[in-house]
Amino acid sequence: MINKRIIAITAVLAFSLNALTAQGRYEYGGDLAGGARNGTSSAVSLLIPQGAAYLTGGGAVATATGVGAAYWNPAGMARATNNLETTFSQRSHFADMSVLFAGAAVKLGNNSFGVSIRSLDVGEIPVTTVFSPDGTGEKFSPSNFTAGLTFSRMMSAKTSMGVTVNTTSEGFRRVKGTAMTFDAGVQYVDFLNVTGLDVGVAVRNFGRPMRYEGSGLLTKAVEVGTDRLTQFMKIEPAEFDVPMLFEMGLAYDVMPGLQVSGTYESNNFEQDKVKLMGAYTLPGLLTVRAGMLMETETVERTDDSRTTTVDESSSKVEIDNLYDGFSFGGTVYLQRYLGSNASIDYAYIPTGFSGFDDSSVFTLNVGF
């Protein structure tokens, strides 16, 4: 009889690769569009890492467990060490933005159920119009909110699978867009019977494009070729794909307390990435971590005179990830001090560009 666990891993892998191929990966509109798809998706907040324990994500797809796995790989939720877990995280983002993440998970036998929410606070933005390009004096605050439901199950003593359904809402003034996305993954502990070798595979943000609606898309205009007076007409916006990605990672316990891990990410809208992390744990006391994020290819964008009013065809701009490079963090375990299964995670993630604030992430975890 064929091993069901191998079938599960293969099925998720095949589904992920097929989905990426169907949506198309790298170019958006070919040469006329002038470059890659960076920044052209909807629901970009889905790409912001949640929680501090996994830094930029090195090996998280293989090692994330409990409620924190709701973002990285829903399969890990079934591997929680507590029957009830809660988490709350705050991340300082660049340009004075911030991200809040909260979640809870309950374990019932081999099954786990979880709920999570995340919100991106952009702050206030001045209102500008065609007739007031310098601003009207008003300000608005965009809204960006995601809620998710997760189901995870232990398929065997070493294999778990999970699915998350997310609903993301983006809005500004009188315009709003909503998208439903799905995450699915599998984790395997002691892969191929190698003690300490964990493997994980996940596809995230699979869903239909987001379309924006609302009265803010109405504008006053006169229909050409008619005798009609000025009337309201609706601007039909284009659909924007969600930023689907595929991750495959592994982690290995080199020695008691020392783990090294890595993840390969194939992203539908950005360059592919490699994420690495090393962690050393003193049981019951603390864990220290160091991570690294790097892109597998260099992309240069050339502006095309056929798609811009300014001829900049001779200038090339290299597209880099804001968080390329090293990151650091750790966890302090509070059980011996508080008597409850609680911990605090911290991550420091520098940006690679001057003028952008580095990110600091704090996470409080409590288990019962």
Segments predicted by a language model, with ranges:
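N-terminal periplasmic accessory domains that precede
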Residues: 68-79
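Acidic, small-polar-rich N-terminal luminal/periplasmic segments of exported/outer-membrane proteins
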Residues: 50, 57-60, 74
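Bacterial N-terminal signal peptides that target proteins for export
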Residues: 1-9
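Short strand-turn segments of transmembrane beta-barrel domains in outer membranes
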Residues: 59-61, 84-93, 349
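A short, polar/charged loop/turn motif at coil->beta-strand junctions and beta-hairpin connectors
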Residues: 51, 80-83
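Outer-membrane beta-barrel porins/channels
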Residues: 23-55, 99-368
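Bacterial N-terminal signal peptides
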Residues: 10-18
